[in-house]
Regions:
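Short linear motifs at protein or domain termini
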Residues: 1-96, 210-216
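Conserved amphipathic alpha-helical segments that form helical-bundle/coiled-coil interaction surfaces
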Residues: 100-162, 174-184, 190-203
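C-terminal effector-binding regulatory domain of bacterial HTH transcription factors
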Residues: 1, 192-216
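A ubiquitous short alpha-helical element
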Residues: 71-76, 94-97, 115-120, 161-168
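Short helix-capping and inter-helix turn/linker motifs at the boundaries of alpha-helical repeat units
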Residues: 5, 104, 169-173
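Residue-level recognition of short, well-ordered coil/turn positions
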Residues: 22, 57, 121, 189-190
C-alpha cells in the first residue's frame, strides 16, 4: 500500500471531522489551527484545504479562514436524486459485462458493512462509499467515477445528521440494501438490483426529510 502523504493525511483528518459532525456548517477553520492539530508545516495544510474547497466541502474566506459550507435541504435532495440517475445508469451499463469476480467482491464489501455494528459516522460512511464507488466503477467510466466520488464527498456535510437520526429511530439500513443489490445481480435481475440501489440512496433523503419536518 502506498504511504499516505502529509497532504492526504490532513485532508482525510478534516474530512473525517466534518463527516462525524465535529466541524459543523459555517464553522471556520484556520491554517494555524490545522497546523497545530496535525503537527505539520503550512504547505500540506494549505494544499489539503485547497482540495477540500475544490471538492465543495469548504469555502475560502479571505482574511478569515476556511468555512464549512452550509447545505440546504434542496441541495441535499438534488445531490441524492442526481446520484440515483448516475448510479442506476452506471449499473445498467455495466450489467452485461459483470463477472462472477465482480459480484463476489461486491458481496464481500456488502457483508463487511452489515457485519460491523459500530456507531461511528465516518466508518459507516466510508463503507457506504466503498460499495457505491466500486459498483459504479464497473462500467469503466473514469469521469463518472470522479464525479460520483465528489458527490459522495459533498454528502459528508450532512451525513452525520442522517446516521444519528437513523440510529436513534432504529431506522438505519446497515447495508441490507447493498446485500439485496448483490442478491439481485447474482440472479441476473437488473430491474430488482436497480430498485434496491435506488432505495438505498433515497433512504438518506427520506430520513433527512423526516428530521427536517420534526425540527420545523
Amino acid at each position: 500500500m502506498q504511504k499516505e502523504t502529509l497532504k492526504e493525511r490532513v485532508y482525510r483528518g478534516i474530512y473525517e471531522s466534518v463527516t462525524n459532525g465535529e466541524y459543523k456548517s459555517n464553522d471556520i477553520l484556520t491554517e494555524n489551527q490545522m497546523i497545530e492539530k496535525f503537527g505539520v508545516s503550512k504547505s500540506p495544510v494549505r494544499e489539503a484545504l485547497a482540495e477540500l474547497c475544490k471538492d465543495g466541502i469548504l469555502t475560502n474566506i479571505p482574511r478569515m479562514g476556511y468555512q464549512v459550507r452550509a447545505v440546504t435541504l434542496k441541495e441535499i435532495i438534488d445531490i441524492l436524486e442526481f446520484r440515483v440517475d448516475v448510479e442506476l445508469g452506471g449499473l445498467r451499463k455495466s450489467f452485461p459485462i459483470l463477472t462472477e469476480e465482480n459480484i463476489a467482491m461486491l458481496r464481500q464489501i456488502a457483508e463487511r458493512h452489515s457485519a460491523d455494528v459500530d456507531r461511528v459516522v465516518f466508518k459507516n460512511w466510508q463503507r457506504n462509499y466503498e460499495f457505491h464507488t466500486y459498483l459504479y466503477s464497473l462500467n469503466n467510466n473514469v469521469y463518472g467515477c470522479e464525479a460520483l466520488q465528489q458527490m459522495i464527498h459533498q454528502c459528508s456535510r450532512y451525513i452525520s445528521q442522517y446516521f444519528l437520526s437513523a440510529w436513534q429511530r432504529k431506522n438505519e439500513s446497515n447495508g441490507r440494501y447493498h446485500i439485496a443489490v448483490v442478491d439481485a445481480l447474482e440472479r441476473r435481475n437488473i430491474d430488482e438490483a436497480c430498485m434496491y440501489l435506488e432505495k438505498d440512496i433515497l433512504a438518506v433523503k427520506e430520513e433527512i426529510l423526516t428530521l427536517h419536518s420534526m425540527n420545523m
